[in-house]
Amino acid sequence: MSLHQFLLEPISCHAWNKDLTQIAISPNNHEVHIYKKSGDQWVKGHELKEHNGHITGIDWAPKSDRIVTCGADRNAYVWSQKDGVWKPTLVILRINRAATFVKWSPLENKFAVGSGARLISVCYFESENDWWVSKHIKKPIRSTVLSLDWHPNNVLLAAGSCDFKTRVFSAYIKEVDEKPASTPWGSKMPFGQMMAEFGGVSSGGWVHSVSFSASGNKLAWVSHDSTVSVADASKNMSVSQLKTEFLPLLSVIFVSENSLIAAGHDCCPMLFTYDEHGSLTFVSKLDIPKQSTQRNISAMERFRNMDKRATTEDRNTTLETLHQNSITQVSIYDGDKTECRKFCTTGIDGAMTIWDFKTLESYIQGLKIM
């Protein structure tokens, strides 16, 4: 496990470049900081300053090396590097509320932006006019869209929102997409068509994160009522739900076709598996607990605690987990959704941790990624 403390401020979101030598993070403000690996250290190389509201989403396209950002200023920017300088291009989102989340499509020819305007902006580049334009998916979304994930076919888009529902839409844009083949989610895919809807008002909570599996047949999501859910399109849209005893999870991602990692307010990642019978199971917390020891607090730690945990108390408040506050995002570091070898977490404590499954398997008895 390698932990790096970037800041005292929370890291609201992050994204890696293709060869994992650079990470883009937002220190809970209107800026994006790009750090480059130099030996064992991370050195700040660039600051992207164009937004005038909190940045809420970052995604870095691996093939085209473009960064897309969105923020509370209702704007999105596509950043391209020229002669070592990152240049922004404004995207016309046509929204009247904050943008909340952004994600490049697998082919990198479009991206989707969720927002508080109860809609999803699907953006693509119009070469005739030399600008990025957007189309809106509105119905039947009833509240803020918190999370998005693309199906591997580059057309279907999963969205989790504050109306307690997870939906799968078609984001087919005839200007840039080839006609999609039929999938277990459905065969007819005109733009904006809702292919599936899960969740309800009687139970559930805000859907904080959604993730398709590598095949695209399974969709996982985590809600504010501490549940983890998986829908399987190949099993007639059957849904498996696990009500956990933990604090709410904020981020989820598939690390193999049947395993997923989720993390949130409990400050440590957790492994869940989904078997061929459609059963969803909690496997283990993936942290290596530190033994807490009684000690006097230094002046430096006192000030750090004021920033990190809003406390000045002398008693030792260090958590036994590596992260000292809620984890806000989980991403794959080494590998892909078919076979992930290492994954990354960032959190409100301003820290970034890279977790190695081989190391975790040697520490945690009986742990095996399916």
From Swiss-Prot:
SMART domains: WD40. One of its GO terms (molecular function) is actin filament binding. The keyword Nucleus applies. Its main location: cytoplasm. WD repeats lie at residues 6-45, 50-89, 140-179, 202-241, 244-284, 322-365. Keywords: Actin-binding, Cytoplasm, Cytoskeleton, Nucleus, Repeat, WD repeat. One of its GO terms (biological process) is Arp2/3 complex-mediated actin nucleation. The keyword Repeat applies. SUPFAM superfamilies: WD40 repeat-like (SSF50978). Gene3D superfamilies: YVTN repeat-like/Quinoprotein amine dehydrogenase. It is found in: Cytoplasm, Cytoskeleton; Nucleus. GO terms for cellular component: Arp2/3 protein complex; cytoplasm; nucleus; site of double-strand break. It comes from the Eukaryota. Probably functions as a component of the Arp2/3 complex which is involved in regulation of actin polymerization and together with an activating nucleation-promoting factor (NPF) mediates the formation of branched actin networks. In addition to its role in the cytoplasmic cytoskeleton, the Arp2/3 complex also promotes actin polymerization in the nucleus, thereby regulating gene transcription and repair of damaged DNA. Belongs to the WD repeat ARPC1 family. PANTHER family: ACTIN-RELATED PROTEIN 2/3 COMPLEX SUBUNIT 1, ACTIN-RELATED PROTEIN 2_3 COMPLEX SUBUNIT 1A. Component of the Arp2/3 complex. This is Actin-related protein 2/3 complex subunit 1A-A. It comes from Xenopus laevis (African clawed frog). The gene is arpc1a-a.
